[in-house]
Amino acid sequence: MASLEMNDLKKIGLGLTGFGVFFTFLGVIFVFDKGLIAMGNILFLAGVTLTIGINPAIQFFTKRQNFKGTISFGLGFLLVVFGWPIFGLLLESYGFLVLFSGFWPTLAVFLQRIPLLGWLLQQPYIRSLLDRYRGRRVPV
């Protein structure tokens, strides 16, 4: 079972993940700059690997139910590197959603604890959507 304490590698991993998201966002803002998007992807993957560990990351990306997401994220990355940033980013987005769809319930619980957002998420329609996915485990 993974340790919940924040050691230095996990802190660095979270920082790299944040920078990866930031660089990808900058790449989209700067008219789909393939260099920034590729750098963001590398930083994101390195950050996820350092945050959860090398072996758990390999197990996560090679699980049978995550295979479709891993392939589409990888092909999207290759499309970005080879000069098709718009199509690559679309394919990466699909892969990201497939890979990390199991984390949405955990994220929803975290967001409900933020003061203004928590009130918004407690509204009946939104709460019924969130309750449907509550109780699932995080897939790591």
Curated annotation (Swiss-Prot):
It is a multi-pass membrane protein. The keyword Membrane applies. GO terms for biological process: endoplasmic reticulum to Golgi vesicle-mediated transport; retrograde transport, endosome to Golgi. The chain crosses the membrane at residues 12-32, 35-55, 71-91, 96-116. It is found in: Golgi apparatus membrane. GO terms for cellular component: cytosol; Golgi membrane. Keywords: Golgi apparatus, Membrane, Transmembrane, Transmembrane helix. PANTHER family: CGI-141-RELATED/LIPASE CONTAINING PROTEIN, VESICLE TRANSPORT PROTEIN GOT1. May be involved in fusion of ER-derived transport vesicles with the Golgi complex. Belongs to the GOT1 family. Homodimer. No interactions with STL1, STL2, CESA1, CESA3, CESA4, CESA6, CESA7 or CESA8. This is Vesicle transport protein GOT1. It comes from Arabidopsis thaliana.
